[in-house]
Amino acid sequence: MTLKDLKIGKSAVIKTVGGKGALRQHFLDMGMIPGAEVTVVKFAPMGDPMELQVHGYELTLRLAEAEQIEIEQIPRRSNSHKRIEALSDAAHPGLGEEGKYHSKKDEHPLPEDTMLTYALVGNQNCGKTTLFNQLTGSNQHVGNFPGVTVDRKTGTIKGHPNTEITDLPGIYSMSPYSSEEIVSRNFVLESKPKAIINIVDATNIERNLYLTMQLLEMDIPMVVALNMMDEVVGNQGSIDVNMMEALLGVPVIPISAAKNEGVDELVKHALHIAKYQERPLRQDFCDKNDHEGSVHRCIHAVMHLIEDHAVQADIPARFAATKAIEGDPLVLEKLKLDTNESEMLEHIVQQMETERQVDRSAAIADMRFDFIERLCEQTVVKPKESKERIRSEKIDRLLTGKYTAIPCFIGIMVLVFYLTFNVIGAWLQSLLEMGIDKVSELADAALTAAHVNSAMHSLVIDGIFTGVGSVLSFLPIIVTLFFFLSLMEDSGYIARVAFVMDKLLRKIGLSGRSIVPMLIGFGCTVPAVMATRTLTSERDRKMTILLTPFMSCTAKLPIYSFFVSSFFPKKGGLIMAGLYLLGILVGILVAFLYNGTLFKGDPVPFVMELPNYRLPGAKNVTQLLWEKAKDFLQRAFSVILLATMVVWFLQSFDLHLNLVKDSSDSILALVAGCLAPVFKPLGLGDWRICTALISGFMAKESVVSTLEVLFAGSITSVLTPLAAASLLAFSLLYTPCVAAIASVKRELGGRWAAFVVLWQCTIAWIVAWVVHLIGGIW
């Protein structure tokens, strides 16, 4: 019987885990080990993937992968374990000990001027970035779906200028399954931080401690931060922190990063262990009596075999030994074992597999989870089912229900766009437009009264105020849309969207996880491209990056709003929704093309944790809105202002730098006129349109400011509604801005970046031509 056959609400014990390579290792690291109890929670609305509960947390798995896991419906192995021996030197500090948690006899403090570097390491979605913000005073974005942090972020602990802490991407283990796991592991191994701050989700402690055990093997000073302890206590649970310290051999500090509780004590311990280089007191988790000591003997034999190589490779021996047993290719490559040593390693491991009756990777994973179970038996009083879990289950009945999930998703997105473009955003925009017009009138009157030179007067009023002012008026719409996207992300709903949409996305060759970067793409392409780093497959990552530009970013909203209000004022909401749907439809068609040509093959398995729903924090939402508004304003008064001034100059002077009365005689008309024939079949042969589209490569908002400057408010008398529709279609799909292209170049290289520019322009031209052709027939 396989896991695929298990019914909803039924439990079973895992017998064997099939598959191979990094994916199988990832399953084991996530707790899908022989002997583990697993329960089916539900299936996605379309029957695939499935949601499981294992080791007290929920994760998703496709039926194709579940079919590789054999189960048996028998009682789980006894939870009666041999107690772990406590380490007497690891007692929790008493009052006033200032972070000194064990014997000082071997202390050798680092010089006072030493830079104390820290790696902040933890599972995805455990509160790492929230803690990082509390420690440093930074305002990094915080979300409630796995994979928010996709790059390293560095800061200084408040009040301690000689410190540097790096927030690493969230990982489940130190196995090289995904790019962020490789980034985090390489940072710890190669950058050699003075200490590690390991943040652990106390509400999901068994799964989180799996990473802790691997970090302890790396023999780096470490402090464990038990986050979300307020939720544990609130749900009538408890953790014996003193005992946990004694069993792990490192300081364990209960904290609530969201409430800034316990953070000061954490800082004291972190400073102390780094300064005195107090390394973990326990790195050996194998029981010499477990299964007649087969794993114990194997690990210690391998440690002796590779010890010299580990020293030369600068890898901790214990960590290198367990990774060598697992067959980790990156570690084995660094160890540089000769043929005889490799054969001896294989012989030792095969002997262990024969005695243990499971394969090497499963044996190591089982050793770790067995230790974790014994640790939790002695230290953790599990809370009753949390309020957050109960609330999430009730909400999920509607938002992930078989018949309600997709209608709810469509309804939520329609509501978001309606409120953004027809209610809240539109009302705020009209208020801001009135204010900008009033300021422009006052500036015009002041310049006239001061008898300012006509050219300078034109630059300020017709250039800066008309151009930049028109872009600024769209700030409320952009902020409103980001507000709703932030609510969806912080609440945990976006992770559910990935779960619900996985089967649909698989039909175009993608994984459900790709929905996250694509939804972010509706806000901005730059972070959307970066968010693809959470995808484990290079094929999926490239394909998602190339599809992200088809998701219309908020920078294009000013273009849509400008043309809709000018040409289709009574059909604003309908046309806006139509543009977004057109972008998605074209993206789907292109995905089919990619899947059959450039990126043949199957999408990677869908293994993802579903976090509990949480109420979005007002501080986090406000912070995100401020960041987006600030970014928009900076662009408006830098790139867009510069582009507006350049456009004004080029359309005001001829090649002899004489002020022209007719802009058709200007430098700009001469240059843009060369491109006009390309756009003529689209009904966009006017050189001013070409100029606006070129300026949009710098920043999409510049299209509107350029049109305002060049047409001086008379665009409706020049373009027809059909030409406006064609221009909207082209603006929707043509090349992203230079910042987005730079992010594509950083992720995929220059050739792919150039491909995106040319490909998007080609697609945009074809779609705009079709729109113009169909519109002409009607």
Each model region followed by its residue ranges:
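Transmembrane helix-loop junctions at the membrane interface of multipass transporters and ion channels
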Residues: F550, T554-A577, A739-G749, V770-W778
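Canonical P-loop GTPase G-domain recognition
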Residues: V232-F285
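Conserved C-terminal guanine-recognition region of P-loop GTPase G domains, centered on the G4
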Residues: H160, R185-V252, I559
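Extended helical scaffolds that flank P-loop GTPase cores
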Residues: G249, Y276, Q283-N453, L659-L668
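Conserved G1/Walker A P-loop phosphate-binding module
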Residues: H92-S173
